[in-house]
Amino acid sequence: MSNHIETKCIHGNLDFSWDEPTKAVSFPIYQTATFGHIGLGHSTGFDYTREKNPTRQHLEEILTALEGAYDTTAFSSGMAAVTAVFDLFAPGDHVICSEDLYGGVTRLVNTIGKKNGLMVDFVNTGDLDEIKRVLRPETKALYIETPSNPMMEITDLSACAELAKEHNLLMITDNTFLSPYLQNPIALGADIVIHSASKFLCGHNDTIAGFVCSAKEELAAKIRLIAKTTGGCLSPFDSWLVMRGIKTLAVRMERQQENAGSIARWLTEQKKVRKV
């Protein structure tokens, strides 16, 4: 029996989220750089926090449950997560991106990406014909924000996933603006889901973080290698802050939808407002 999303926000897919062996109800912050070994060549599974940390791992397990992913890697910011995903590509590879993207992503692909030989086209991904128009043999992926930041443009993820599968492309989706509470891109065919956790996931404006949720084992292994090698990992304390924030994700999203509906209804009654 699968857990409801409210339960996953607190426990992930576990029966409980107590720390072993302490049984701490609030998962501890393992604020350490290194971990001792039981004996020579006998690791506990944790060696160095850049590679793996219990607090961060617990948070990653919660995101994996929320997004229905194979695995999740936590990063020090949303842009660190995006950068790790673009590190999957080689010079000469081509990526098709939504024309309306978060400015940091646009800057990344137009500067560092271009310097490293990445080719990018920005199109209206809500129009499949526009995507097909720029397809080329070097195309490796679709990169989609829906709703997009900042113009809230919408893309049909299922339709794009079918197109991506037809052309053997990676389907990458930024799910920051809807969160797992309202949308699960992997269930709609995405291979990779990205989050900037400083928005709805954390919800308290007190930290920044990013996630890459991978649908398949091979992709997950590549992302973890990039994270371990480049070092953009999320700290134990920030992992705990995001974990705390996610506990209230469901109730916050419900109230935010209610508030948005109230504002929209009020605006429709204003004579000076033409369209809502």
Sequence positions of predicted segments:
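Conserved N-terminal alpha-helix of the aminotransferase class I/II PLP-enzyme fold
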Residues: 34-83, 87-88, 104-111
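Short beta-strand elements
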Residues: 274-276
